[in-house]
Amino acid sequence: MSVLVGLHGEAGSGKDTVAKLIIDWCNDTYPTCLSRRYSFAKPVYELASVILGVTPEFLGERRGKEIDQWFTVTQSQLERARDVWFKYGIDKFEDFSYVWPIFEEKYLNPQQLISENKEDGLYSLFISPRKMLQLVGTELGRQLVHERIWLIILEQSIAKDDPDVAVITDVRFPNEGELLRETNHLDMDSLLVNVVPAEQKFTIKSDHPSESGIPAKYITHELVNKFDGINNLKLEVYNFCDLELEPLVG
């Protein structure tokens, strides 16, 4: 039976590391098992990175993710963003050329837009990578396009791959929890794990809706990250997988 494993938790709680360890467990325990890692935010990272003219990896670097910095937005970058829009089928819900000016005026102007005089440069934007990701994911995608846009894209991706184990690293919104536990159309068993840091000093606080949590009724398990070394975390994750995941996969 195929299994959908969702990970929930505050920013900085270690969800990505836990996801990697679950995939490692799958490879170690069931070498022929097809296990894949997924993220609701993958198209968000791709869109935000081309808009800002950087790589998705740059936006994901924790050391600079919270720091406001200057980015130059160019016409060619917006054209590439439109290509990403088409790549993920977002144009089936809203046209990029219609939605972008609304988003730009309502949400980017407050982030200190300064007009550029350089050729092809439209303006400079002073913003942190995390804030840009939040705006693209929630205000642009969920509010201006469709509340379920990132869920729809992820469901299509999982259905296409047809993995034995799909690990979703970033379950943040109530309808994402609902997708895993109540309304998924993928014919997969599901677990939703809350990754909890033993000490709150490791997490990153935010009042953005994407960090407000999901209803407890969707959470099936809790895994405590003590931040006491990768080997200890591996033991915790492997023990969890032996007890909870193996009966569903085996």
From Swiss-Prot:
Chain residues that bind dGMP: V44, K65, R130, G137, T138, W150, D170, R172, E176, S210
Enzyme class, UniProt record, top EC level: transferase
InterPro entries listed in its UniProt record: DNMK, P-loop_NTPase
GO biological process: one example: DNA replication
Catalytic activity from the UniProt record: a 2'-deoxyribonucleoside 5'-phosphate + ATP = a 2'-deoxyribonucleoside 5'-diphosphate + ADP
Impact reported for T138A: About 75-95% loss of enzyme activity depending on the substrate
Alphabetized UniProt keyword annotations: ATP-binding, DNA replication, Early protein, Kinase, Nucleotide-binding, Transferase, Viral DNA replication
Pfam families xrefs: DNMK
Signal peptide: none
Residues holding ATP: G14, D16, T17
Entry similarity comment: Belongs to the dNMP kinase family.
Function: Allows the synthesis of deoxyribonucleoside triphosphates necessary for the rapid viral DNA replication. Phosphorylates all four dNMPs. The enzyme had the highest activity with dAMP and had about 30% less activity with dTMP and dGMP, respectively. The lowest activity was observed with dCMP as the substrate (about 35% of that with dAMP).
Protein name: Deoxynucleoside-5'-monophosphate kinase
Organism field: Escherichia phage T5
